[in-house]
């Protein structure tokens, strides 16, 4: 029943809702977490109010992982339901245009504005930094490699529960610092493939789990795991010797994995509970917001850094109000810049 309904529409309504929601949470999160380094260093002693700190932790648990999952989810939909098939090199070029070229264009601007220093500049460091993704753009080269891996999985029909479990295990293994997006690849490949896998099991999931009982269960588990990760495990990490290492690399990483999975499933099932109802259709502004997500992601860190680091904004506004007002300014300006960029052909090629 669900599959038939989905084939009759071109948009994935759940994606049209989840994508702008997650980007909004991402901007909100950064509006809180970047304050301490804001105002040109004049507010390095700024401390988040305890309630705000918990808000950050609840958002932080699954927001960027959800973006990765949605990428694999849409790829799987296009492959399995729309029958889209790409040869390898045309697919690589498509993702270069979509991810790598915007990373380079905006990365150069970010480097010049916020990283460049005549005293420490070297061509080698510039190239490595640029190709690894300047600032928040690190997500783009990492996602590029995830797409290459997912193409191979799809092409050679490797989709299975065992692969999902294997990638989950790999995602919790510490990785060394590597350039070009490879450091975070093992962690995020699990979520991209998780989205791919989720689409293939979507009908089964809806048949067995699309109820408020499961939704509440996932949200409850997520809240518990957030509290464990931020209230209990920090004390365990202070232990020395073997027990401390187990807490740090075993329990800590496993808890974060379970926390992200529960948060993603809670959000996904909550949204799908509404989007699968007969006659549901997102408002036009929701679809428009989904189309603007890429631009908001790219621009928000530019606006945030300028606002927090190069103006006295943080010093002049009451601490209770700073993150909320900062969020409103950052989101508004990012949307405006996205709208202006999409008016040009070049802009549409970059973030359209």
Identify the function of each model-found stretch.
Residues 129-133, 173-184:
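Membrane-interface helix caps and helix-loop-helix hairpins in membrane proteins
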Residues 115-120, 173-178, 227-241, 309-314:
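Juxtamembrane "helix-exit" motif on the non-cytosolic side of transmembrane helices
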Residues 156-166, 197-223:
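Hydrophobic alpha-helical segments of polytopic membrane proteins
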Residues 207-287:
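Alpha-helical transmembrane segments and terminal signal-anchor/GPI-anchor hydrophobic tails
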Residues 64-77, 141-151, 180-208, 256-277, ...:
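Specific transmembrane alpha-helix
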């Amino acid at each position: 029943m669900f599959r038939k309904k989905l084939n009759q529409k071109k948009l994935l309504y759940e994606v049209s809702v989840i994508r702008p929601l997650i980007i909004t949470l991402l901007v909100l999160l950064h509006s809180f977490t970047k304050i301490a380094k804001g105002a040109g260093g004049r507010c390095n002693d700024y401390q988040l109010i305890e309630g705000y700190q918990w808000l950050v932790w609840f958002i932080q648990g699954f927001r960027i992982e959800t973006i990765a999952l949605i990428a694999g989810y849409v790829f799987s939909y296009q492959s399995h339901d729309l029958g889209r098939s790409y040869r390898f090199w045309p697919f690589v070029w498509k993702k270069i245009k979509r991810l790598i070229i915007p990373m380079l264009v905006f990365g150069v601007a970010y480097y010049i504005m916020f990283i460049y220093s005549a005293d420490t500049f070297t061509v080698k460091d510039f190239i490595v930094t640029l190709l690894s993704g300047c600032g928040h753009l690190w997500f783009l080269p990492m996602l590029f490699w995830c797409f290459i891996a997912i193409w191979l999985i799809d092409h050679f029909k490797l989709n299975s529960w065992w692969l999902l479990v294997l990638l989950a295990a790999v995602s919790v293994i510490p990785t060394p610092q590597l350039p070009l997006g490879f450091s975070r690849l093992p962690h995020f490949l699990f979520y991209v493939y998780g989205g791919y896998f989720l689409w293939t099991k979507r009908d089964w999931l809806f048949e067995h789990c699309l109820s408020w009982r499961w939704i509440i269960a996932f949200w409850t588990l997520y809240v518990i795991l957030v509290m464990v990760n931020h209230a209990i495990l920090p004390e365990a990490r202070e232990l020395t010797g073997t027990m401390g290492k187990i807490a740090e690399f075993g329990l800590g990483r496993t808890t974060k994995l379970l926390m992200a999975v529960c948060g993603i499933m809670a959000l996904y099932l909550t949204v799908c509970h509404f989007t699968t109802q007969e006659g549901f259709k997102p408002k036009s502004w929701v679809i428009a917001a989904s189309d603007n997500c890429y631009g908001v992601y790219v621009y928000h860190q530019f606006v945030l850094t300028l606002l927090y680091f190069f103006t006295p904004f943080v010093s002049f506004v009451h601490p209770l109000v700073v993150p909320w007002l900062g969020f409103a300014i950052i989101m508004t300006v990012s949307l405006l810049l996205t709208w202006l960029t999409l008016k040009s052909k070049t802009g549409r090629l970059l973030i359209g």
